[in-house]
Amino acid sequence: MLKLKEGFNGERTIVLSKIIVDLLDKDPLASMLHITDIGYYPKAEHHYIERKEAINQYVFIYCMDGCGWYCINGNRYEVQANQYFILPAGIPHTYAADVNNPWTIYWIHFKGELAPLYAQNALHPMSINPEAHSRIGYRINLFEEIFHTLKNGYKTENLQYVSSLFHHYLGSLRYIQQFREANNDSINDNNAIETAIHYMKENVERRLTLKEI
């Protein structure tokens, strides 16, 4: 079976150099939580990663469409659309796209003193169900802002801003109920058209059926 680490049509990735990562490890703000690698893989057919040697970063994967799976500590987990998981640092693992319905994923490698807090309870697949107040589009925009800020260069202000954004990004998942309730007045649940439009925006990565809408 063909196994690919990268090279997918439409992929986007940024890998920070060791020099930059070492600077982040020592930065008063960024050392608390910072990104080392970030990317987006659409329809990642044959995607397969096996790490027999543990790495010192946490691995965040957010499946927007399709399916996949991962193995860690002898356990295998299936991942569906609108689910994410975080693999802890220091433990060998394997993950891959489904053969018949490969996933579309946003992924981030990260580390820092607060990394264990944000990764807590996310070893199992965590669902982010699209609904009136799910704010999935907002979170995607946060990812894009992080990505483009890094793409604009690695000066200290950029790196510290990315660290601040990433706190917000992971916080929107770790404290998902609070994240949703903070903006629960913006959508009128009784307006069917408004709700349908919002649902389509929250599922921009997927091909929705009329029944789902």
Which residues are covered by each model-predicted region?
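Short, Lys/Arg-enriched, Trp-marked, Pro/Gly-tolerant hinge/linker segments that flank
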Residues: P125-G137, L150-S164, L170-E212
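Amphipathic, well-ordered alpha-helical segments in soluble domains
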Residues: H34, V59-Y62, Y138-E145, L165, ...
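Juxtamembrane segments at transmembrane-helix boundaries
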Residues: L117, E145-L150
